Amino acid sequence: MRRQLVITTQVYPVAGEFKISRSTLTHIPVVMVEIHDGAYVSRGECRPYKRYNQTVESVTEEIESVRSEIESGISKEALQSALPANASRNALDCALWDLEAKKMGKAVWELLGLDKPKARETAYTLSINTPDEMAAKAVESAQHKTLKLKIGNISGLDACLAILEARPDAQLIIDANEALNPDELKQVQNELSDHPIIFIEQPLPADIETSFNPQQQPIICADEALHTVDDLPRLWSQGYRAINVKLDKCGGLSSGYQLLKTGKAMGFKTMAGCMVGSSLAMAPMMMLESLADVIDLDGPLLLKEDIDKGLTYKNGKVWPPIPALWG
């Protein structure tokens, strides 16, 4: 039977608001694809992201551009060259993996030859606010032992220090989303070098020609600067020593698997990350948890509501998806 591609959109309200250096969000628009293939229906979700010049309309249009190939039975392998590494390809790639798992009667982790995924501690994100408010939120989030702090400028250092005082049991990820300059980064590293900081995520704009001292603590993690495996040698030479792999950036589970595997082999600390989205967007990455040193899949926790049959979150941990959700 010929496949049928169905494209839908959904808007998820944020629990409160989600503020990072470049924007404040109250609603998260996502694009979901379904591939109908006789007895099977598979799914994938992506998040159009303004930072990469994506909108719901542009992503939908790009997915539509390969409708005939999808409905004619394109393989996961051929999809990699049919679309660039981006959100559109992510949704389709994940749906094709889900379809193969259903048809083969095997979980995606088995198809990849990986260890069975297990429940993992996930980082929990605190969006930008005053130091007192962020410290209070950190105390409220006592079940989460790893906290990701969004900062928008050098004043965010005060919030970091306030949270370290309020939650001495926690380890932190500092995420500046490209908001600092080199002098400010040096100040942040000097202030935090003796504290339990896993890494500082994308402190400088991704397109700045710069290098980091890999011996300086905390180490630097690439987020906006990382998209595909081809970026890894350059990032290593620049002094990045950690990578945040997101399926919406790299173009799906196929490339996410290669990124985590190759990055780990090169010596990077690896993080399985996400855009804010539903459990359907998190589920594919949970299949790769054995390749990740750090899990940052808290997207559904930041929403007012999640998709049906979503991931289980409890006591700071996230569990792998049930087959009714994905994979």
Q: What do these predicted regions represent?
A:
Residues 149, 154-290, 304-316:
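Catalytic core of soluble alpha/beta enzymes
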Residues 300:
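Active-site cofactor/co-catalyst pockets and adjacent glycine-rich loops in catalytic enzymes
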Residues 293-296:
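Short helix/strand-capping turn motifs
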Residues 1-172, 179-186, 191-193, 307-327:
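N-terminal capping/lid subdomain adjacent to the active-site entrance of alpha/beta enzymes
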